[in-house]
A protein has these predicted regions:
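Active-site beta->alpha loop and helix N-cap motifs at the rims of alpha/beta catalytic domains
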Residues: 1-42
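Alpha-helix-loop-beta-strand connector modules within alpha/beta enzyme cores
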Residues: 1-9, 44-54, 104-119, 165-187
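Electropositive, surface-exposed helix/loop patches at the edges of structured domains
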Residues: 9-20, 68-74, 180-190
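Short beta->alpha junction loops/turns
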Residues: 13, 33-34, 60-62, 126, ...
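Glycine-rich phosphate-binding active-site loops on the catalytic face of alpha/beta enzymes
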Residues: 27-38, 143-165
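Catalytic alpha/beta core domains of metabolic enzymes, predominantly
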Residues: 40-155
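Amphipathic, soluble alpha/beta structural segments
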Residues: 85-91, 163-172
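Histidine-acidic metal/acid-base catalytic patches
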Residues: 139, 151, 155-160, 169-182
């Protein structure tokens, strides 16, 4: 809260939800390894009952849209109104160009099923490395995702986790400036 910027954190248990709420976190997200387990999602959902906070839900690590949609339904059933989706790619066996294969067709299908939800893309987790981040972010924008979730660190090589997929704040600003945004804000008629 020192910076005045909104904060967000991943939650996987009721205790983590309680702690995040106690510390005034602005947005919560359910991670891919939690989304894959309906019992874990229900635990998080139960902890959110009666709370008014935006919740983002990452796709499960395996390519199963029913699990993803089920997580959305569980969170919605406890009264959460502001729900969004995060596409972070899916695990695949063997060597691929990506850390998590995008399987864009599955993301598009999920957007078709739940068009009213905010839908953002996490190219950091899809790529797992910096050198293909820009192209993947651009593809997400070309596919009309509503936004991007990109990991940034002042010293990426020394980050405690996922160091290879993080970029500096300066590189993030540069990348965002290079993206060709497809949607333009339409001025309101007042």
């Amino acid at each position: 809260k020192i910076t005045g910027l909104p904060t967000t954190v991943e939650v996987a248990t009721a205790k983590q939800v309680e702690d995040a709420l106690a510390f005034g976190v602005d947005v919560l997200w359910v991670g891919a390894r939690t989304t894959v387990n309906p019992f874990s999602v229900q635990e998080v959902a139960d902890a959110l009952r009666g709370v008014d906070i935006p919740v983002l839900i990452k796709n499960p690590i395996n390519p199963d849209l029913e699990l993803w949609q089920g997580a959305v339904e569980r969170i919605a059933r406890v009264g959460i109104k502001q729900i969004g989706l995060i596409h972070r790619g899916f695990s695949a066996y063997g060597n691929t160009e990506f850390r998590n294969v995008p399987m864009w067709h599955l993301a598009i299908e999920m957007k078709r099923r739940l068009p009213e939800l905010l839908f953002i893309n996490d190219p950091s987790h899809i790529c797992g490395r910096r050198d293909i981040l820009q192209g993947t972010a651009q593809k997400a924008i070309d596919l009309e995702f509503d936004g991007l979730m990109i990991e940034s660190h002042i010293d990426p090589d020394n980050a405690w986790s996922d160091a290879k997929q993080q970029i500096t704040p300066e590189r993030l600003a540069e990348m965002l400036g290079e993206i060709r945004w497809r949607k333009e804000d339409v001025p309101s008629e007042e």
